[in-house]
Structure formats: C-alpha cells, structure tokens
Amino acid sequence: MTKSIIASEPPSAESSGRLPWKILGQTTGFPNQDQELWWLNTAPLLNEFLAECQYDVHLQYQYLTFFRHHVIPVLGPFFAPGTTPNFASRLSKHGHPLDFSVNFQESGATVRMSLGAIGSFAGLQQDPLNQFRAREVLDKLAILYPTVDLQLFKHFESEFGINHADALKVAAKLPKLDRATKMIAIDMLKNGSMTFKVYYMVRSKAAATGLPVHTVLFNAVQRLGSAFEPGLSLLKQFLSPLCDAGETDLGLLSFDCVPTESSRIKLYAIKQVGSLDAIRNLWTLGGTMDDPTTMKGLAVLEHVCELLQFGWSGDSRVQPILFNYEIKKGSTPKPQIYIPLADRYDEFDAAKLKAVFQDLDWKRVPFYQDTGKDLASVL
C-alpha cells in the first residue's frame, strides 16, 4: 500500500510538534535547497508511516537519520507536481523517485521505501538512462552494511547494462518513463536492521538488443545456471506464450541483496483481466499448481476480492492487473497479485482490510483492533 510522497503543503510547526523528522531537520541542516525541499515534502510522511505502524521513537530517529543521510542526497533536483524533471522515475505517474509503502504480514507491518536514485547527469547526454547512481548507492551500502551482498547485482548489471552509444539511441526512442533502468527497495525492520532489494526495468535493454522483453529477462536468469530451478522453467513455459501473443507484459525483475543461494528472484508482469477465473489462472499457472499452499493462498485472495467488492461484470470491468512470481532454488513459483485500489474510498477499503486481518488472525498487525480510520491514513 502506497501513498503520494509530495505533500500539498509543508506541515506547520504546530501540527508537527516535536516529531523526530522536525527535530532532525532543524539540527542537521542541508547543503542545498533541493535536499531541504525533498526533506520537507517527504520526511513527515515517512515519520507518519513509522509511527502508525508502531515503530518506537528510537527506531523512528534511526530510520529518519538513515533517510536524511543516504536517501535525500540521491533524489536529484526537487520538482513539484506539474513540472517536468530531466529524468522521470517509474515509481510514480508523476516521475517522482521515491515511494513509501507498508507490507502487512502475520508478523506485523513493515515500512518500506523504494528509491530511484538520480545521478547528476541523469537524462542528459552523459547518462541518458541514469545507469550509474544506483550502482554508487549500492556500493556505499555494501560498505556500511556488511550483510549486503552484491553478487546477483553484478550478474544482472552485466546482463542489463547498456553502453553509452546504445544508451543515447535508446533514450531517443523511448518515452521518459520507460528510460529508467533500476531502483532500490529498503525494508526497515523493527529489530533495527534493514534488508535491500534491487529492481531492474529492462525495456531499454530490449530496445537496445531488438529482443522481446521477456526473452531478455528469461535469458538473464537462465545464465545463472540451475540456481532458480525448477521455478524458472515453469514460469517460462506458462508466461512465454502469453507474452508472445501480446496478452501479458513482463518487464520487471527484482532480487534480494543476499547470497545467490538464499535470494529470491521475482518476475513482475501486467495482464488485462476481466474475471475471477482469469485471476485463478494466473495464480495457479494455468492450473498446473494445485498444492495446498497455493490453493490456500487462492482462497484468501478470493475472500479479499469479495470483501473489497472487487468483481467483474462484462468487458467494461476489464483492467490491468499487476502480478509477480517469486522463485527460489528447489521450489515452485509463489504468486502474488496486486489488487488496484486507486480512486476508491480509503476508509471503506481500510475497514474491509481490517476484516481480512481479523479473519486471518493477524494480531500483530497494528490496525487489528482499530476502527479502520488509522489504517486509512497509510492507504
């Protein structure tokens, strides 16, 4: 669940009180106006997410300090809604390079930030596809946090990287939002540690090679050998015909910054869906997966769709659905489907999601006993 990162106006001192974001902003200072504006327009929201998800004040300071020193400096020039940046991120429809979200699981709620780090020359002739800043950020994180493993990053960087001459040609062809190549996601855990994940958008690489996007993705994972079998073969068998027929758009890959043998790889796709049967087909890989875990997850998904009154009736309700499959060595793919909640009534959805948490007996979710109003604040 995500929320727009740009506030309509900076919060007043009265409404902010002595919140950690306010104190840090007053005491650390900023080297330029861009960083100060990014802080004023994003730190209050991050603070709100952390507080609503029951992070204690010490963790709020810890993660806001990390945000101040390691994220704010790589967001590039500040731009307000309605203005056009030199380089647009895929993280939002407005091209902003930052997104906050909350991951709800039985163990509780985890706040995540996703970052499309912007280089000094991003979108310009020197770096038309903004290929270098994310690499610099990850190299720095690997020094600061020894648990960050860049083995998979180096593999996919060699697979998806584009030389400068080709990058110039590709940038001239692609729309601005399709020029982004990678982003970083950071989970801020309640034990004080962080986990890091990298996302690759490969449309630019496909444009440079002339190969279909799904072929570029599958080839890159296959060159890791058997590290992600049998899941990779099952996905390729199911998704390739859908992609070849133009029915599914597969264009995004992510992985954990941990040793390869421990990492997950996720492949993300979009498909036009007009029925619950189509959702079932995606969830079970066309009916080929019917193990107890898969079918239990499908039952929960159907229940959530019913509670949220997310149904279909006729072609007028056909809409794009984002989904992904997680693969690890020795296991079958694990599906995940994103139910679109944009342009809906947040408090209605919050009340229904609270009912889901209660049905699942997820007592560690912060909003389990709440009215739904607090949950709506992070939708």
UniProtKB/Swiss-Prot annotation:
Signal sequence residues: none
Pathway(s) the chain acts in: Secondary metabolite biosynthesis
Keyword field: Transferase
Entry keyword annotation includes Transferase: yes
Biological process according to GO: alkaloid metabolic process
Keyword check for RNA-binding: no
Pfam families the UniProt entry points to: Trp_DMAT
Reactions the enzyme catalyzes: aspulvinone E + 2 dimethylallyl diphosphate = aspulvinone H + 2 diphosphate; butyrolactone II + dimethylallyl diphosphate = butyrolactone I + diphosphate
Gene Ontology molecular function, alphabetical: transferase activity, transferring alkyl or aryl (other than methyl) groups
Coiled-coil regions listed in the entry: none
EC number(s) from the headed UniProt entry: 2.5.1.-, 2.5.1.35
Record: residues binding substrate: R90, L91, R112, K197, R264, K266, Y268, Y338
Deletion consequences: Leads to the accumulation of aspulvinone E and butyrolactone II.
Task performed by this protein: Trans-prenyltransferase that acts in both the aspulvinones and butyrolactones pathways. Prenylates aspulvinone E and butyrolactone II to yield repectively aspulvinone H and butyrolactone I.
Family: Belongs to the tryptophan dimethylallyltransferase family.
Annotated NCBIfam families: arom_pren_DMATS
Name of the protein in its database record: Trans-prenyltransferase abpB
